[in-house]
Amino acid sequence: MAHLELLLVENFKSWRGRQVIGPFRRFTCIIGPNGSGKSNVMDALSFVMGEKIANLRVKNIQELIHGAHIGKPISSSASVKIIYVEESGEEKTFARIIRGGCSEFRFNDNLVSRSVYIAELEKIGIIVKAQNCLVFQGTVESISVKKPKERTQFFEEISTSGELIGEYEEKKRKLQKAEEDAQFNFNKKKNIAAERRQAKLEKEEAERYQSLLEELKMNKIQLQLFQLYHNEKKIHLLNTKLEHVNRDLSVKRESLSHHENIVKARKKEHGMLTRQLQQTEKELKSVETLLNQKRPQYIKAKENTSHHLKKLDVAKKSIKDSEKQCSKQEDDIKALETELADLDAAWRSFEKQIEEEILHKKRDIELEASQLDRYKELKEQVRKKVATMTQQLEKLQWEQKTDEERLAFEKRRHGEVQGNLKQIKEQIEDHKKRIEKLEEYTKTCMDCLKEKKQQEETLVDEIEKTKSRMSEVNEELNLIRSELQNAGIDTHEGKRQQKRAEVLEHLKRLYPDSVFGRLFDLCHPIHKKYQLAVTKVFGRFITAIVVASEKVAKDCIRFLKEERAEPETFLALDYLDIKPINERLRELKGCKMVIDVIKTQFPQLKKVIQFVCGNGLVCETMEEARHIALSGPERQKTVALDGTLFLKSGVISGGSSDLKYKARCWDEKELKNLRDRRSQKIQELKGLMKTLRKETDLKQIQTLIQGTQTRLKYSQNELEMIKKKHLVAFYQEQSQLQSELLNIESQCIMLSEGIKERQRRIKEFQEKIDKVEDDIFQHFCEEIGVENIREFENKHVKRQQEIDQKRLEFEKQKTRLNVQLEYSRSHLKKKLNKINTLKETIQKGSEDIDHLKKAEENCLQTVNELMAKQQQLKDIRVTQNSSAEKVQTQIEEERKKFLAVDREVGKLQKEVVSIQTSLEQKRLEKHNLLLDCKVQDIEIILLSGSLDDIIEVEMGTEAESTQATIDIYEKEEAFEIDYSSLKEDLKALQSDQEIEAHLRLLLQQVASQEDILLKTAAPNLRALENLKTVRDKFQESTDAFEASRKEARLCRQEFEQVKKRRYDLFTQCFEHVSISIDQIYKKLCRNNSAQAFLSPENPEEPYLEGISYNCVAPGKRFMPMDNLSGGEKCVAALALLFAVHSFRPAPFFVLDEVDAALDNTNIGKVSSYIKEQTQDQFQMIVISLKEEFYSRADALIGIYPEYDDCMFSRVLTLDLSQYPDTEGQESSKRHGESR
């Protein structure tokens, strides 16, 4: 098997001197520390295989010499040489030598050119451009992240289809150009064919055109004779009818004058009555104003009186309550005085009883001196013997006395608290009743207040709206008056203007659809600055009356003559000779056409404006107007904003004060609207004033609301005071008293129980003491004859103590009663003082109420007097209004009669005007028909007169124009026409319907023929010559089209050939790789479940779009390449590299650190695959840093660095074939089991 044997390098990069690297085995790994020069082996192989210098990590070729990178090249030359051994054993050498700044190539030690050198490399399977035997460091990682388009480019390099890109693009560009030329020639041929058809049609149309002209001429003669014949008949009938109507009209005019005089007299009487009514209304308004002032004063006085009366009632009620309380207080004082008198009587009775007892004691036992001494001695013995018990007894008695006094005090307090509690309950009941009354009164006030508030809101809203509207109306009215005053026209119009306005109104009534109005009323300038200029251009036509037709204009002129009114200018829409607009004038700078600065709401009026203004131009200044009028190739009619007019003839007409006066007519046309609006606003203002008078009612309601609110406030304050202060205080006091009462009762119970218990103990101690006394005083008692010593002592000692105690109790009770009596009397005195104060207040309030009632009565009297006067004036107004309405009714009746006669006169005038209009219309029709015959050269025969005498009516002054027209019509009446050529059936027609129907038929025939002639283009005299020219051009275009189509077919064939070659080269490579990559990926992964597949984005031309590459790792679901791990991406990239290598296999394959991104598992898989493939497929040389990988190789080449001035590389070799590959055997065994 062919293989790379040795690599000989000399002074190349890190290799100093001549170094031999090899021999290389089927699977050789190059190892060494980082920076030792391993990758320089890869660069040496690339260099010797013809790689470009730019791809060898240097800028120029001399940097490849050892030491050049530090500026100390060891030699001026360097070389790299490989020894390649064929399967037959034949050796081939390839060498590349650096000499100076270039390199030379040697094959088998013979100097050859680069192309020969590359060809020899391709013979052994090494393609330099595709780099099919070298995989540089990082290439594997870059392959895994290539974009589909980049992957396509990679395949084009491998398949060599990329060499055809230039030729492919060139052929494609030529094909597109040829197809475009063919399409262009085809379109040209089609257009010339259409021209040929058109030329044929022109020839046929020229022949038809002449026959149509002859037929049209005969029909026009018949039409004109028919119209002239029946026109003359109609003129004769109208003259007869006009004489009858004029006689009836003169009779009706006399009746109209009579009724007009009656109406004027009635109007004068109505004016006098109206003035009287206005004076009455003025007085009534004054009275109502005064009444509106007095009525609130009366209401206020009434409310004040009512308020004081209520205060007086409250005071009286307070006196009544205070007197009731005083009466009760007096009863309590009497009870206390009675109790005090009873106590004094009992005390006196007790003292009297004591005196009797003292007299009785003098008769009782009395001891001798010896016995008394012995008593004292025995008593001292007893005292000493019972001293302890006596002390305890005295203590108990003192405590007992204290508790008894406390019990008596608590019982007194109990009685007092019960009395106070009863009084508090009564006061609470009184306040509750007061609360009920106040709540009821408050509710009544609130209901009344709510009702009045609603009325107030309604009135306020109505009055505010009225005031707002009055303000708006007054502003509008002031604005209208200001506009009228500014215009200087807020005065009565002159009789002349009024007469002209009445005449115009009369004409509008006679011809409502035909008389439009004066020209300045129907249009206006778009801005005020153009008013003078437009007025100047309009000239005498500014006050002209615009009518629909010439017939109406003539009827109006006849009416003016009959009414002896001032002459008027009429502009008939159907009679105006309008010149076309020169559109080029609109493009001139510094000016505008006059017709463009005039605005109108009537579309039909544009013809009139165009007739009056022509092609006139308006300019900002006089200089601009002069320049535009005189400086151009043609003179123009121009006008400046100040009214200066430049005519084409060179005449200059300046603006004047008279022109400014005339220009005011643009504002005068708004007068009628302004006056109408002023009348409407005045009437509306009167209605609003009536509504505004409701302010009096509003003030009354507001006064009532204010009084009610005040009363409600006082009531609510009192209610709140009672609820939140008085009643709460009473409830708190009641609660305190009840609590105090419970405390007193519980205290009394506790004291009673304590007294009972202590009394028992006192009794026990007393019995013990008594027994001791009895023992000691036994003999003494027997001597004095008493049962025991206590009997003696009670009679003489204890009785005195009881008397003293009783006196003390009497004293205490008397003191208590005196204190209570003094307090009650003091309280009663305060109540009486309060009652006296309230009585004084009542007396003063009564006096104030008397004064207030008098003021109220005075106000009421004034209001009643004003109301009576108001009613009197209203009655007068009703009477005056009735009289005015009666006279107005009479005026209306007379006016109806006047209008009825006026309508009859108008009807007759309208009929006269209508007949005259019809007559003038018929004369005009005859004139126009004769004029048409002359102008259109229609050959009718005249028995008298000549068509040459027919002239067009010229526009001069109105009087001149009317007289000229009459002269022309009289002259034309003398013409006698020969109707012998007119068909008899057309002469025999009588009714207007039949005449109109036949006229329409004749007109349709002529119009149809004219329409055909109009639609038919004038014949082309050169149609035959054009037809021949077009035929020659058609033949030329046909020849050009065939030639371009042939050229396009040839370009298509050439392009398809290149496309097929490129497609075949690319597809051959792609199909081989896409088939083999799946098996290679399975072998690399050591698992048949792994999948790898390639798919083109453009199956028809895959080299134009991208190529997708996807792998499914064992045990994982499908996911995009970007989502695979680093090791999986590396394995997938290696599979692609090995698959591409299998398409164009090189004899050896050099890889630079392809295992960098692989983990130990994937390293084992990749190394096993490489081991298998190197047995019989290709030679593999790998630069590796991982022991798991290079331990599987057949031989190792070690690269290590040495240093002096610069680093240089050394090489070691080791044959591993003598060492068994146990790991590889185990891996193969596991792989076999997994299968």
Curated annotation (Swiss-Prot):
GO MF annotation list: ATP binding; ATP hydrolysis activity; DNA binding
Superkingdom of this protein's organism: Eukaryota
CDD domains: ABC_SMC1_euk (cd03275)
Domain SMC hinge: 514-629
GO biological process, one term: meiotic cell cycle
InterPro entries per record: P-loop_NTPase, RecF/RecN/SMC_N, SMC, Smc1_ABC, SMC_hinge, SMC_hinge_sf
Keywords, sorted A to Z: Acetylation, ATP-binding, Cell cycle, Centromere, Chromosome, Coiled coil, Meiosis, Nucleotide-binding, Nucleus
Location of this chain's protein in the cell: Nucleus; Chromosome; Chromosome, Centromere
Cited Pfam families: SMC_hinge, SMC_N
GO CC annotations on file: chromosome, centromeric region; cytosol; lateral element; meiotic cohesin complex; nucleoplasm; nucleus
Chief place of localization: nucleus
Binding locations of ATP: G32, P33, N34, G35, S36, G37, K38, S39
Coiled-coil parts of chain: 156-490, 666-934, 970-994, 1022-1049
Record-listed N6-acetyllysine modification sites: K648, K713, K1033
Function: Meiosis-specific component of cohesin complex. Required for the maintenance of meiotic cohesion, but not, or only to a minor extent, for its establishment. Contributes to axial element (AE) formation and the organization of chromatin loops along the AE. Plays a key role in synapsis, recombination and chromosome movements. The cohesin complex is required for the cohesion of sister chromatids after DNA replication. The cohesin complex apparently forms a large proteinaceous ring within which sister chromatids can be trapped.
Annotated PANTHER family: STRUCTURAL MAINTENANCE OF CHROMOSOMES PROTEIN 1B, STRUCTURAL MAINTENANCE OF CHROMOSOMES SMC FAMILY MEMBER
Stated family: Belongs to the SMC family. SMC1 subfamily.
Subunit architecture: Forms a heterodimer with SMC3. Component of a meiosis-specific cohesin complex, probably composed of the SMC1B and SMC3 heterodimer attached via their SMC hinge domain, RAD21 (or its meiosis-specific related protein REC8), which link them, and STAG3, which interacts with RAD21 or REC8. The cohesin complex interacts with the cohesin loading complex subunits NIPBL/Scc2 (via HEAT repeats) and MAU2/Scc4. NIPBL directly contacts all members of the complex, RAD21, SMC1A/B, SMC3 and STAG1.
UniProt free text on domains: The flexible SMC hinge domain, which separates the large intramolecular coiled coil regions, allows the heterotypic interaction with the corresponding domain of SMC3, forming a V-shaped heterodimer. The two heads of the heterodimer are then connected by different ends of the cleavable RAD21 or REC8 protein, forming a ring structure.
The protein's name in its UniProt record: Structural maintenance of chromosomes protein 1B
